[in-house]
């Protein structure tokens, strides 16, 4: 009786359930082929017809170009029976699947899935992320029993391959790769060709040719030395460049077998010179050290920085994938490539990738050589190319997403080495989502989940205002690796890019090629330019994931890091010179070119309409001018949730002088005279905003900041001189007034409703301007929905006082102008006490709007102006997980919001509740606001689409 056992989500099959090789003459392609390192490998046809638990059949037919076909039935949920740390895959069977990413990492889970659906995947084993976690907890040593489990998995691979690690007569070489649950391109380590030593390379040379064998050996020595032993790659690269110069060749592929054999000896000497120890020749020791190195790379500075930048938390560690090697460097019938099943930059439904003849995969991914377009493969390896195209279709249909695929062709045989969901730009993400809905692959709710909020952020980035205007300034053209436009000053190191960014400067990071260590500078830079590397190089993949403009593989440039100069022909560009990049065309442009805001595409409008159909939360905008209001409306805002009246005061010298006269006034009469000068300015601005928001609510906050913010900046003598000119007062009078205005802690002082209560004429002027503008616009056919918001309320009595002033002025204006209209009066909840007594305040207010910026400030006791002195220390030490001014503190500030909402609605069931801090555009905060039942969020105009999508993703 055959048995099947479920273990932690895998289907483990008994030996007699495995597919057996059919006898007889074999025919080409579409078959699952046994990996073989010989020059003339035998093709094997596998036919598996036995019914398995949950799998009806997996068929692989030989002959013609018929692709593998898999017919899968759903498997019932597995029952955990034991803790397993090593999972094997290959030959049409796997101990894992695509849903086990948290345990096997993305790479391991997808290798298992590809093998199980019948694609040609070299057999291997995956060490789980939980094993990595145990390794870290065990003092960075392999936990007890794990090495034996790895060797057991290795025996499976050796049996599948009829080859052995360290056996010169039947050599088995391995790749050792990382793979976390969330893709982190280039951040962790890889070792290829593991298992080579002097004896094994001689055996491999006898079977596969000396040049191939010694090329593989020198690559292994370089990679193992760098990744495992910590020897700088540059030490090996120097030897390679010296050898090429000595032999008078330009390419690695032009070196002979004898040259490479000599290079191997030089590489072995590098170990002794750099580390004082010899290269380890025992293959099993090599494997143990490589596994340790991959586990160690999880905690490397570059990996930690990447996770910090991308806010990746909660992962156990990286998995380790050990796989038998297939070789793309066995001559002109071999090669390696990376592709995306659709264009990751534009979303176009067309294979997008690169291919290198006679090369290994790291040459493409690391950007060491600039590869050819994928189309070259169709010409030189047509059968393998056709199989690859068919595999891409299978994977897209299976995963229902755009896939990123690594593959190798060994002597015209295609092998699939990796697949994962492809990283894409904002433009690409939206088009792929819309196209896949139109193709019937996914539904609109799935599409909403496929586009990340940061993708929309990228789409809102500027482009060049007039590309035709800079054509005469184009000095070089590289590969358009990541779209968009970037303008900045040239820097030549990641550290300088971070430093310049911290100083508020826009930097263009220029490198010969980027490495994972550059990740901090890449994130800080406005754009990235590299001399080497293709569209799938490290720089390109990381930049696209961030929506960062990148031009790669620009062969016309020469980078001198030591001299900090960039040479293009006879032109020299120094550090600090201005450069512009067009990541959509690959153009490198001299000088500082003008940027223009982006426009919504038809695909984006379609996509956002799907998001709007499902979201519950309304999305408003914080807008202070008519132009801001128009931008907000064009971005889909459903009204203005915060219009800050004080920003209007800085629009001209006349306005600010009138404000200063009001501040310096001694008597109410003087103050009223100054306010009368301000009223027409305010009224005009409100008219423009009401016109822009025709038919949508506009929430106007009365004056909030402390008065000292409107005084001139500079030393006291300068301030007094300027105020004397502006107000006509004597210097003594001004000194006296400044002394009275000075405060120890202005943000907790004389501001907000305290100003309106102390100077009612200030509230009266602003309210009169609001209602005069509203009636005037109404008379012109504009539908006006005004809402007046009283700031910094901490007691119901404060709000009651201001409401009395507001309603009195409204009645007077309506009587004067012969028209009445509906309006609302509410308050900001930004003082913790207001949240605690929300039921009392709700009896006075028609709406609450949480000012989360000040509410966070007062709840934590952090001054926003001073928090930078310690915030980075708190974040780096884990005292805080996020900047609370960017990501809402849900346990503290969030609970005040939840409590105030519940109390307020209990006292006033018709109470409208929203939030108008910048947290309104932050996705995790938006999810919280939806969960506690707020009616709307309000954020900056450019973040409105992000908030719309975040509100929809909460629902789906």
Curated annotation (Swiss-Prot):
Enzyme class: transferase
Active site residues per record: 538, 916
Entry GO CC: chloroplast
SUPFAM superfamilies documented for this protein: Glutathione synthetase ATP-binding domain-like, Phosphoenolpyruvate/pyruvate domain, Phosphohistidine domain
EC number: 2.7.9.1
Assembly behavior: Homotetramer.
Protein name per UniProt: Pyruvate, phosphate dikinase, chloroplastic
Lineage: Eukaryota, Viridiplantae, Streptophyta, Embryophyta, Tracheophyta
